[in-house]
Amino acid sequence: MKDFSGTLNFVMSLRRCFIACAVSISVAGCSSPSTESPPKSSVQSAKAGTATTAEQPTSSLLDAVVPNGYSSISTDDGRTRTYKVVDLSNGEDDVPMVLVVHGFGGSAEAMSAYTGIEAALAEAGVDAVVVYPNGSGADEGSPQSWNAGGCCPFAMYGPVDDVSFFTRLISTVEADYSTDPDQVWFVGHSNGGMMGYRLACEIADKVSAIGVAAGALMVDACAPSRPINVLHLHGELDAVVPLDGGDAIGIVFPPTRASVDRYADAAGCDPASAAATNSIDRTCGAARVSLVVDATWTHDWQPDWSRRFVDFFVTTSRA
């Protein structure tokens, strides 16, 4: 029998944070949960289409502590953002940049530890520069999140300009390392996957492929400047972002298939199949948009997800 304890703890953490933010409609309203979130499950939730005007964060909320081994950049909204780079280029030039993005309540360090993306790249023989960014929290120690449109607090209420952050982050890494601007790969879990969809909709010229793990498309408008490669992995046992969508912890998520088809339609892919199936494989010129569903997967990061994403990126980049 599957153990959902980690997922349930995340649900309760997000419920507390979401209610606090919604009641106060302010940055300070999203406080740290009393218990530490487990490292292997990452929850994101928000009501799609919610627009909230919040107070501007104080300077204490804008300043981030930069951990040892991390770099930082300043963003247009006045924040200091942190990220870690792992150089696996082995001295090669024009290697892929791989952005690996945590979900609600997660961190760059945890994402690095539990995804095994570096091992998957090594097994595939891919030299790369791997980047682990941190999201934003209301204050030091509060749950970190990404503003993926309709999700998640604190970032969505800040509001934090995460699109600008990723634009600047990609440019900074390209300037500091010998990466290929045509091979910028994004892997996101939960709220991180939602952020991937937002980037695919809004800065497709900066990102060539996204891997979405247990996420959803939560922006109101999606008008990509070009189609990019998308692989969405989702489990039938996901109790946080349900495969069939609907109300989860008071938040309405779109069905997973609807998220994938909506992006594919916006990107100008070939028509969706009318067959009643959870799998999707659509082409948009040279780009490919795919959904893979498994009956045994939960919301937690699954052991083979990193390998699946890397294999997909390698295959589609050579197409």
What annotation goes with each model-predicted range?
Residues G135, G211-V219, G235-D238:
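Active-site nucleophile loop of the alpha/beta-hydrolase fold
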Residues L233-A239, L243-G246, I251, D294-W297:
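Conserved strand-to-loop "acid loop" that flanks and positions the catalytic carboxylate
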Residues L231-L233, P254, R262-A319:
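C-terminal catalytic histidine-bearing segment of alpha/beta-hydrolase fold enzymes
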Residues E109-Y114, G141-Q144, R198-L199, A221-S225, ...:
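Short, solvent-exposed loop/turn and secondary-structure capping segments
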Residues C30-M97, A128, G158, N191-G211, ...:
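A domain-start/cap signature at the N-terminus of enzymes
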Residues F4-F18:
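Bacterial N-terminal signal peptides that target proteins for export
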Residues S74-K84, G91-W185, M195-R198, E202:
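Serine-hydrolase catalytic machinery in alpha/beta-hydrolase-like enzymes
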Residues A20-A28:
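Bacterial N-terminal signal peptides
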